[in-house]
C-alpha cells in the first residue's frame, strides 16, 4: 500500500478563526480525543479548515454528507485542494430506484426496478480501489456508506496480479476475469469488459473508463503490459506489473460460493417446513420457486439478480451480524468528518428501521428468505463501533453531537471574506404579501435574488402563483423534485432566469447562492421544527454570502426561538465587524462559478456512459422524446419531468402499468438530456 503524504494546493493561508480551529482540532486528534465539534458559520471556510486538518494529520478521511448535492459540492472542493491525492466519491449509484416490496392489503408485489448510473458506479469502485492501495485518500460519501457492500477480504483476495514475464496463459486469465465478473465483449468495449484479438487481451478495469490495459502474450507467458486509450488504441505507457480488481463488490470464489449455496438450501428447507406446518402453502411454493431459480443462476453464472440478498451466506456471517460496508474498507486510524451533522447524524440512525420494515413484509410472505434481513444498513450502534475519531461539522450542531463531544468545540465565526451575518428584521404579518412583493421587486431591479420560505405547501403554491401574476419570475421548490431537477432550478435562479425561489423546508442547509440578498420567512412565530432556533439560524445563513444580505421575519410576536436565533446572529455579526475593522477588510459578495457540483461527476455520462438499467428497466426501450416541444432550457425540461412523474404515479394508481412504464422511460430519457444541458 502506497504511503504518500497529503499535499494541500492552495494560494490562501488560514485566517480569521481558521488557524485556531485547525490547531485545536489537530491537537485534540493527537491527544486521542474521539469526538469533537467544529462549529462554523456559513461562509467561514469550514471545508478549508477540514482540508488543513487532513493534511496535518496525514490520515485517510471520510467526509459524510447528508445528500448527493452536498457530497458533490464537497467532492469538487476537495479535489481542487488535493489534486495529487486520491479524492473519491461514494454515493448511491441509482439514477432511479424502486425497491422490491409487497403490499399485503392489495396483494400487490412490486418488483425491484432501477437504473444504475455507470459513472457513479465507476467512482464507487475507484473509492474502494483507492482505500486498498494507498493511504492518502479522502472519500466524500452519503449515507450509502453504511449500506451493505461486499466483504473487503473477499474483494482483496480475488484481485488478479499480472506481471511481465509471468507464466499465465490467456485462457487462465480469461477464466479469472470471468470469475470476478468481467464480461467478454469483442464489439462493445467498455468498463468492466475485456476483448481478445489474437495474442492480445485488453480489459477496462471497473474503476476506470478512460484507460484500458493491453496484455500481450507469447505462448503461455505475459510478454508486455501497457496502458492504452480504449477509444483510439493509443499506447499511453508501459507497465511492468499491475493488479486488476474485481468488477463487482459482491464477488466470491467458487469454493465459497458452493458453501454459500449449501447454506441457502439448508435455510430454504427449514423455512419451507415452517410454512408447511402453518399450512401456508402459497408462501412455501413462492419461496421455493424463487430461491431455486436464484440457486440455478448462481450455479451456472456465479451470480444472480439480487445476489446481495444472500450476502450473509456469501460472507459467512451469523444471523443478525452486521454486513460489511464502506467503513470496513478504511484502516483503523481513519478520520471521520460529519458535515451538517445536525441532519446527517439523525439520518444515519433512521436508515435501519425503514429498510427493516419493508423487508420484513417480503420475508413474512415468502418472497425472500429470512437471511435477506441481514442485507441492510448498519444500526446506529453498529455505526458507532466502526468509527474512530470524529469531527462533527455544523453551524448548528445538535444536542447529540454536543453531548457526545463533551464540550470539545472549535468555534469558527470569522469569515475570511469579511462578510457579516445578515441584518435580521421582524415585520408584522398584516399586509405581508404586498410588503414582500415590494421587497422582491426592489431586489430584482438590482439583479439580486430572493428566497422565501413558508410553512405549508398550499401557501407556497399560492404565493408562487400570486408573485408570478404580479410580474415576477418565480419558481417553487418542493419535495417531489429530485436532486438533478433541484440543481437545475437553483442554477436558473443564479443565472437570473428567475428572481424568486419559494420553498418550505428546502432552503436551509447547503444552498450556496451568493446572488441571494434577501431571505424572507413567513409565519416565523409559529414554533416547531421548521421554526426552531437551529432551523432559523440555518435559514438566515442563506443570505450570508452576499454583502447586502438581509433577513425579514414576518411575525406578530417574537418567540423564544426567534429571539435566540437573532441574538446568536447579532453576536456573530458584531464579532465579524470587529475583526473587519481591525484588519481593514471591506465585505464583498462571494463570486462563485455557475458550474453545478454534478458537472464533473456526470461529465462521463454525457459522453456515452449514460447508465445501465437493471431489472425490467433494461428491457424497456425508451420512447423518443421530442425535447424541443417542451423547450430546451433545463428549467423547462425539469418542469416537464415533474408533469410526467405525476402522470406516471396516476397511471400506476389506476393499474395502467404499460402506460406508467412508457412514462417512466420518457422521464429517464429527459433526465439524461437534462444532465447534458
Swiss-Prot record:
Protein keywords: ATP-binding, Cytoplasm, DNA damage, DNA excision, DNA repair, Excision nuclease, Nucleotide-binding, SOS response
Helicase ATP-binding domain ranges (all copies)? 27-414
GO biological process entries: nucleotide-excision repair; SOS response
UVR domain residues are 638-673
Question: Transmembrane segments in this chain: where?
Answer: none
Sorted alphabetically, which SUPFAM superfamilies does this protein's record hold? C-terminal UvrC-binding domain of UvrB (SSF46600), P-loop containing nucleoside triphosphate hydrolases (SSF52540)
Residue positions binding ATP: 40-47
CDD domains documented for this protein: DEXHc_UvrB (cd17916), SF2_C_UvrB (cd18790)
Tell me the compartments it is located in. Cytoplasm
Pfam families reported for this sequence? Helicase_C (PF00271), ResIII (PF04851), UVR (PF02151), UvrB (PF12344), UvrB_inter (PF17757)
Q: Which residues form the Helicase C-terminal domain?
A: 432-594
Which cellular component, as a GO term, is one annotated location? excinuclease repair complex
Q: Which InterPro entries match?
A: Helicase/UvrB_N, Helicase_ATP-bd, Helicase_C-like, P-loop_NTPase, UVR_dom, UVR_dom_sf, UvrB, UvrB_inter
**What terms describe the molecular function in GO for this protein?**
ATP binding; ATP hydrolysis activity; DNA binding; excinuclease ABC activity
Q: Where is this motif: Beta-hairpin?
A: 93-116
Function of the protein: The UvrABC repair system catalyzes the recognition and processing of DNA lesions. A damage recognition complex composed of 2 UvrA and 2 UvrB subunits scans DNA for abnormalities. Upon binding of the UvrA(2)B(2) complex to a putative damaged site, the DNA wraps around one UvrB monomer. DNA wrap is dependent on ATP binding by UvrB and probably causes local melting of the DNA helix, facilitating insertion of UvrB beta-hairpin between the DNA strands. Then UvrB probes one DNA strand for the presence of a lesion.
User: How does the record describe its quaternary structure?
Assistant: Forms a heterotetramer with UvrA during the search for lesions. Interacts with UvrC in an incision complex.
Sequence similarity: Belongs to the UvrB family.
Q: Any domain commentary? A: The beta-hairpin motif is involved in DNA binding.
PANTHER family registered for this protein in UniProt: UVRABC SYSTEM PROTEIN B
**This protein's name:** UvrABC system protein B
Q: Which gene encodes it?
A: uvrB
Amino acid at each position: 500500500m502506497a504511503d504518500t503524504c497529503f499535499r494541500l494546493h492552495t494560494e490562501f493561508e488560514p485566517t480569521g478563526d481558521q488557524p485556531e480551529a485547525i490547531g485545536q482540532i489537530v491537537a485534540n486528534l493527537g491527544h486521542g480525543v474521539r469526538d469533537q465539534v467544529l462549529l462554523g458559520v456559513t461562509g467561514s471556510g469550514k471545508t478549508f479548515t477540514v482540508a488543513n486538518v487532513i493534511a496535518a494529520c496525514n490520515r485517510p478521511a471520510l467526509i459524510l454528507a447528508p445528500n448527493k448535492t452536498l457530497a458533490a459540492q464537497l467532492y469538487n472542493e476537495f479535489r481542487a485542494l488535493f489534486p495529487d491525492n486520491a479524492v473519491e466519491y461514494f454515493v448511491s449509484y441509482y439514477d432511479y430506484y424502486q425497491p422490491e416490496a409487497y403490499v399485503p392489503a392489495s396483494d400487490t408485489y412490486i418488483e425491484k426496478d432501477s437504473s444504475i448510473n455507470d459513472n457513479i458506479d465507476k467512482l464507487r469502485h475507484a473509492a474502494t480501489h483507492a482505500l486498498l492501495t494507498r493511504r492518502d485518500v479522502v472519500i466524500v460519501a452519503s449515507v450509502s456508506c453504511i449500506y451493505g457492500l461486499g466483504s473487503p477480504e473477499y474483494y482483496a483476495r480475488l484481485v488478479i496480479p499480472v506481471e511481465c514475464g509471468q507464466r499465465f496463459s490467456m485462457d487462465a486469465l480469461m477464466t479469472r476475469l470471468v470469475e470476478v465478473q468481467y464480461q467478454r465483449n469483442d464489439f462493445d468495449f467498455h468498463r468492466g469488459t475485456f476483448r481478445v484479438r489474437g495474442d492480445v487481451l485488453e480489459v477496462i478495469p471497473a474503476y476506470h473508463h478512460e484507460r484500458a490495459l493491453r496484455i500481450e502474450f507469447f505462448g503461455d507467458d505475459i510478454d508486455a503490459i501497457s496502458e492504452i486509450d480504449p477509444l483510439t488504441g493509443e499506447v499511453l505507457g508501459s507497465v511492468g506489473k499491475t493488479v486488476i480488481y474485481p468488477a463487482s463488490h459482491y464477488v466470491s470464489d467458487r469454493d465459497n460460493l458452493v458453501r454459500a449455496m449449501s447454506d441457502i438450501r439448508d435455510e430454504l428447507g427449514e423455512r419451507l417446513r415452517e410454512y408447511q406446518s402453518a399450512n401456508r402453502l402459497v408462501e412455501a411454493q413462492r419461496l421455493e420457486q424463487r430461491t431455486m431459480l436464484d440457486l440455478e443462476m448462481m450455479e451456472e453464472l456465479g451470480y444472480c439478480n439480487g445476489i446481495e440478498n444472500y450476502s450473509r451466506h456469501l460472507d459467512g456471517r451469523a444471523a443478525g451480524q452486521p454486513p460489511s460496508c464502506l467503513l470496513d474498507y478504511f484502516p483503523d486510524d481513519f478520520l471521520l468528518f460529519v458535515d451538517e451533522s445536525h441532519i446527517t447524524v439523525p439520518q444515519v440512525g433512521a436508515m435501519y428501521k425503514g429498510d427493516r420494515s419493508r423487508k420484513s413484509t417480503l420475508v413474512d410472505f415468502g418472497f425472500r428468505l429470512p437471511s435477506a434481513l441481514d442485507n441492510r444498513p448498519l444500526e446506529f450502534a453498529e455505526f458507532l463501533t466502526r468509527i474512530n475519531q470524529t469531527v462533527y461539522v455544523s453551524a448548528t450542531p445538535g444536542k447529540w453531537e454536543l453531548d457526545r463531544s463533551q464540550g470539545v468545540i472549535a468555534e469558527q465565526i470569522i469569515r475570511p471574506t469579511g462578510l457579516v451575518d445578515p441584518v435580521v428584521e421582524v415585520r408584522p404579518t398584516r399586509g405581508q404579501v404586498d410588503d414582500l412583493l415590494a421587497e422582491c421587486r426592489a431586489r430584482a431591479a438590482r439583479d439580486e435574488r430572493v428566497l422565501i420560505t413558508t410553512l405549508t405547501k398550499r401557501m407556497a403554491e399560492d404565493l408562487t402563483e400570486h408573485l408570478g401574476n404580479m410580474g415576477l419570475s418565480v419558481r417553487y421548490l418542493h419535495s417531489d423534485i429530485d436532486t438533478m431537477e433541484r440543481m437545475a432550478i437553483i442554477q436558473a435562479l443564479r443565472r437570473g432566469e428567475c428572481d424568486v425561489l419559494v420553498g418550505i423546508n428546502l432552503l436551509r442547509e447547503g444552498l450556496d447562492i451568493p446572488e441571494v440578498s434577501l431571505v424572507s420567512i413567513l409565519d416565523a412565530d409559529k414554533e416547531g421544527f421548521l421554526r426552531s432556533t437551529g432551523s432559523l439560524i440555518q435559514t438566515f445563513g442563506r443570505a450570508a454570502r452576499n454583502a447586502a444580505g438581509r433577513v425579514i421575519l414576518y411575525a406578530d410576536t417574537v418567540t423564544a426561538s426567534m429571539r435566540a436565533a437573532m441574538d446568536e446572529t447579532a453576536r456573530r455579526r458584531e464579532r465579524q465587524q470587529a475583526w473587519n475593522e481591525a484588519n481593514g477588510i471591506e465585505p464583498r459578495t462571494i463570486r462563485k462559478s455557475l458550474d453545478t457540483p454534478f458537472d464533473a461527476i456526470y461529465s462521463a455520462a454525457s459522453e456515452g456512459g449514460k447508465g445501465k438499467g437493471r431489472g425490467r428497466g433494461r428491457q424497456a426501450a425508451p420512447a423518443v422524446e421530442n425535447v424541443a416541444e417542451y423547450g430546451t432550457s433545463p428549467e423547462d425540461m425539469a418542469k416537464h419531468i415533474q408533469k410526467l412523474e405525476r402522470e406516471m404515479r396516476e397511471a400506476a394508481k389506476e393499474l395502467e402499468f404499460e402506460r406508467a412504464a412508457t412514462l417512466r422511460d420518457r422521464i429517464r430519457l429527459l433526465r439524461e438530456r437534462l444532465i447534458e444541458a
